[in-house]
Amino acid sequence: MLILFFVVWGADSLGFFMFGYSTVVFEALAFPLLFAGTFVSLCLSFYLVAKSHKAVLEQVSDPPKLVDSDVYAWVRHPMYLGTLLFCLAFLFISVSLVSIAIWIAFFIFYDRMATYEEKNLIEILGEQYTAYQKRLSKWLPGV
């Protein structure tokens, strides 16, 4: 999926730089806002992915237990959120309608994958995971 995103993003961005066409969205946004969005998205994505891998790998146990510390105390799917934020950074760079559509498709894909995984986690962890679901948002901290 990530390869598909970069292929579409690259082709879309290439059209802007080579042929000079643009979208209304690109013309409406200022460079500082785009730069800030890119920077924040990239930093958050690297942080979330690194911290979530560390939290999970340090707490591997048999039988399985719920990891609800570190970034898993903020959102239920920090690895997926990190990947989505990484793609969002490239969306800020290209700011095209095609990139926005691809990012939305990515979000839907990751949301469905997370929902499927949560069904399996409920089977494995039971009430412990359903209580975790009630405490935390799937994607956004505090929501």
Predicted segments — roles?
Residues A73-L84:
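Membrane-interface loop-to-helix entry segments
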